[in-house]
């Protein structure tokens, strides 16, 4: 049981620069990812209120092909999540229901650096014109509520004596959010989202009720509906230094070839948005060093795959956004109960790789209270 954007593609003449990235829905998911200790079955008939606050910051974008680019990029969010969990028994199994609602706030002006803006292909001027060079895409954004999520769960394995647990938790998320199809970045995609979550935990060394080292594994499978009222958003694009030769090209083309910024104005084309199924895996190795407060520290690793995102225009043309749910991330988690009913958890996350998406450096705090 895990406690708790629209995409853009730059086109310049015949050159296509993929700058797709999934914020909003994926960022909100990250705020309430399964964390160490969530695999332990809780007592029956308790209420759990959980507050999350996640700060994400990206100074570079993971490349679709080749290396990442770390100039002129700022993509930053402050995500808060409120969550409620209630446990009860079903046929002798610890089970329950849960719901959470995220709010995604974009911090400051959002933008992504562009390593190289290719020049247009103009046969009348000899074919491929020189590149404009490095530049920046200005990303419009809308803060707001993400999609609500509703789930149920049941611990089919519950062996406290050996510290072994197994949980099954399906989720559903209706397409209700602060989505604005004309923005580059959004708090959600407004698609029906279905998730199947599986968790397993067991003690490797030590006593489950004392100092111990455990392993916790999580698998999450996502399936998505379509958003028929979405749009393919093109950001405003500017070059850092436009080659002087473009002054001549501008004159020769009667102004058709830009020689001044912005090279491309922002635009929005109505389209249907689709996302293919995606898969996520997490592994944690929590070491509980102070049993009196259940204090632990845990390294972790996260990997996602799949999730190809496409737009189908009204004329039937399908555009690959370039974005995938393909991310590799290191994690470090520490937590302790500060009273009999309140736990505080700190999480640090560092992206190693991301396919066409921000390489995030995240800090998160989670406060859970039992009543």
Where are these regions (language model features)?
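Bacterial N-terminal signal peptides
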Residues: 13-24
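Transmembrane beta-barrel strands of outer-membrane/channel proteins
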Residues: 49-57, 97-103, 168-174, 213-223, ...
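Outer-membrane pore/translocation modules
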Residues: 105-274, 316-324, 337
């Amino acid at each position: 049981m895990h406690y708790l954007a629209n995409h853009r593609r730059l086109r310049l003449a015949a050159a296509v620069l993929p700058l797709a990235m999934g914020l909003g829905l994926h960022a909100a998911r990250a705020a309430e990812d399964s964390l160490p200790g969530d695999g332990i079955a809780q007592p029956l008939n308790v209420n759990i209120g959980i507050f999350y606050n996640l700060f994400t910051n990206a100074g570079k974008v993971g490349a679709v092909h080749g290396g990442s680019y770390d100039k002129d990029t700022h993509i930053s969010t402050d995500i808060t999540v409120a969550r409620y969990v209630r446990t009860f028994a079903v046929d002798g199994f610890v089970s329950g229901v849960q719901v959470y609602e995220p709010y995604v706030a974009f911090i400051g002006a959002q933008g992504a650096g562009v390593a190289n803006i290719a020049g247009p292909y103009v046969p009348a001027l000899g074919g491929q014109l020189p590149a404009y060079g490095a530049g920046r895409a200005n990303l419009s954004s809308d803060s707001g509520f993400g999609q609500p999520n509703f789930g149920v769960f049941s611990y089919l394995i519950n062996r406290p004596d050996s510290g072994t647990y197994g949980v099954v938790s399906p989720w559903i998320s209706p397409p209700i959010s602060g989505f604005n199809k004309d923005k580059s970045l959004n708090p959600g995609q407004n698609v029906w989202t279905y998730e199947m979550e599986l968790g397993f935990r067991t003690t490797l060394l030590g006593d489950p009720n004392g100092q111990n080292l455990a392993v916790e594994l999580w698998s999450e499978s996502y399936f998505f509906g379509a958003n028929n009222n979405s749009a393919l958003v093109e950001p405003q694009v500017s070059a850092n230094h436009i080659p002087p030769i473009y002054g001549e090209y501008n004159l020769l083309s009667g102004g058709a070839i830009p020689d001044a910024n912005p090279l491309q104005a922002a635009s929005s084309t109505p389209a249907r948005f689709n996302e293919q199924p995606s898969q996520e895996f997490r592994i944690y190795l929590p070491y509980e060093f102070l049993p009196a407060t259940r204090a632990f520290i845990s390294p972790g690793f996260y990997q996602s795959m799949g999730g190809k995102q496409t737009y189908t225009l009204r004329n039937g043309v399908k555009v690959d956004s370039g974005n995938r749910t393909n991310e590799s991330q290191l994690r470090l988690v520490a937590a302790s109960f500060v009273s009999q009913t309140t736990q505080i958890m700190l999480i640090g996350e560092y992206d190693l790789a991301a396919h066409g998406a921000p390489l995030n450096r995240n800090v998160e705090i989670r406060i859970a209270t039992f009543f």
